[in-house]
């Protein structure tokens, strides 16, 4: 399972990219708004930092405007993937962008039906939001498992991105289920690195070394 960071913060992306495992970045309008920077300029900057897919979401909600905005964002860098919200207009836009050779990421996916439709429309990726499904009292990991099983059953080429990751165990479960990718917030990645026994072991090694020398 590949690891993406879900962030639009340049310093966060630089830090995590420096660890050597980062394979891509996902952004959304909320994350971009926090940075208070020019949208296209920010996507361009991220694209120069990370050698992998960079998801940039359209703001428009009608098909023609989505396609136009998607083409503009895709022109920033070859690695830019256009995030399209799952709706009727979005499915039309996904199909149109596919015909133009532009990669898409169907976002705000909350059912296996939605994921299947997006894949058949031509989405390069689908992003089920497991944490938000959990928030409704349902099981987001069951949704992820359903999508992975259906795609495996029919050899669907669309890749699955486990999104709305809330804690490290979401990552472990996503990997066990067989998700192609997990896109993970900065703070959760930091939690994944840490373990109290690792910290205690490092502290003991350093203490023993100082005593010996």
UniProtKB/Swiss-Prot annotation:
It comes from the Bacteria. The active site is at residue 83. One of its GO terms (cellular component) is cytoplasm. It comes from Syntrophomonas wolfei subsp. wolfei (strain DSM 2245B / Goettingen). Its main location: cytoplasm. One of its GO terms (molecular function) is aldehyde-lyase activity. The gene is tal. It catalyses: D-sedoheptulose 7-phosphate + D-glyceraldehyde 3-phosphate = D-erythrose 4-phosphate + beta-D-fructose 6-phosphate. The keyword Chloroplast does not apply. Pfam families: TAL_FSA. This is Probable transaldolase.
């Amino acid at each position: 399972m590949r690891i993406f960071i879900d962030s639009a913060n340049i310093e966060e992306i630089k830090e995590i990219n420096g660890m050597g495992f980062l394979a891509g970045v996902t952004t959304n309008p909320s994350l971009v708004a926090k940075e208070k920077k020019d949208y296209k300029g920010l996507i361009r900057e991220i694209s120069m930092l990370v050698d992998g897919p960079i998801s940039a979401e359209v703001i428009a909600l009608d098909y023609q405007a989505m396609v136009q905005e998607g083409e503009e964002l895709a022109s920033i860098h070859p690695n830019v993937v256009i995030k399209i919200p799952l709706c009727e207009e979005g499915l039309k836009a996904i199909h149109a962008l596919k015909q133009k050779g532009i990669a898409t990421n169907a976002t705000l996916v909350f059912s296996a039906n939605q994921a299947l439709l997006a894949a058949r429309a031509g989405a390069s990726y689908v992003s089920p939001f497991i944490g938000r499904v959990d928030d409704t009292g349902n099981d987001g990991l069951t949704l992820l498992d359903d999508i992975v099983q259906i795609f495996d059953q029919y050899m669907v080429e669309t890749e699955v991105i486990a999104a709305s990751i809330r804690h490290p165990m979401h990552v472990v479960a996503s990997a066990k289920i067989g998700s192609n990718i997990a896109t993970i917030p900065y703070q959760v990645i930091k939690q994944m690195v840490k373990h109290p026994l690792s910290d205690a072991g490092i502290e003991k090694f350093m203490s023993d070394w100082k005593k010996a020398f």
